[in-house]
Amino acid sequence: MNDTRIERIRGKMEAALAPVELTLNDDSHLHAGHAGAASGGGHYSVRIVSLQFEGQKLVTRHRLVYDSVNDMMHREIHALAITALAPSEV
C-alpha cells in the first residue's frame, strides 16, 4: 500500500468536501496483473459522507469526488469506487 498516496487522496477529499466520515482503502493488491496496474495507478475505494451531497444526485456526488482528486486521476489513481452519502442517509 502506498501510504503517502493514500494520505494525499484523503487530504484532497477532506479539503474539497469537508466530510463528516471518510473511509479510503487501497484495493490495488486485488488487481495485481490487471492492465491498469502496470501504469502504476492504484485501485481505491472510498466511502464518504458530506453535507455537500445533501439534495445532490448520484452523478453530481461522484463528480464532486472525482473533481477533488482530478490531478491524480489516470496517473496515480487508475480506478476509484465511490460510495457518496449525505449525513441524512447514514
How would you describe each model-predicted region?
Residues 45-55, 78, 83:
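Conserved interaction-surface patches within small, structured recognition/assembly domains
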Residues 18-20, 40-44, 76-80:
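A generic structural signal for short beta-strands and their flanking turns/coil linkers
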Residues 31-34, 43, 62, 78:
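Histidine-centered active-site/metal-ligand motif
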Residues 1-3, 50, 68, 76:
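N-terminal/domain-start segments enriched in small and hydrophobic, helix-friendly residues
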Residues 25-29, 49, 83-87:
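Short loop/turn motifs enriched for small/polar and acidic residues
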Residues 33-51:
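A short, structured beta-strand/loop element
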Residues 1-37:
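N-terminal first-folded block
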Residues 58-90:
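C-terminal structural segments of small proteins and small subunits
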